[in-house]
Amino acid sequence: MTKIVFYRSQGIFYGFEEIGHVGFGEWGEDPFCAMLSSITMYIVDAIEEVYGARVDYRIDEEKARITVRSKAALPEFEEDDRVRFAVSGLFLTYYTMLEDMLLHDDMYEFTKDSGFRVTVEDRDYE
């Protein structure tokens, strides 16, 4: 089971943390884990390379934990509206996509110990 916690401040998404393995397939052959990893790195690369903003990310392979946050999504840290909206939009889009997948979870054959859970924490950027 993968737990994904999105971070939001004053209604604006600025990051997330993914913990665990989806468990749909064997480790290293799980298409859902591959999808989450690909989207995560897409977000990191887009923030850094496309928008030229800073992104803080940590990968702990032993604990199967990835944390991604960017101050550029928040108005108190980023003056350029275009960058801020683009960065926060990446996080919001990822959240919405996962929520949509959960609405249609009957399409996937997860066991009781596999799958993913999505939550949102309202908290200031630390």
Language-model region placement:
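Alpha-helical support elements that line or immediately flank enzyme active sites
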Residues: M35-S38, Y42-I47
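N-terminal intrinsically disordered, cationic/polar leader segments
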Residues: M1-D30, D45-E126
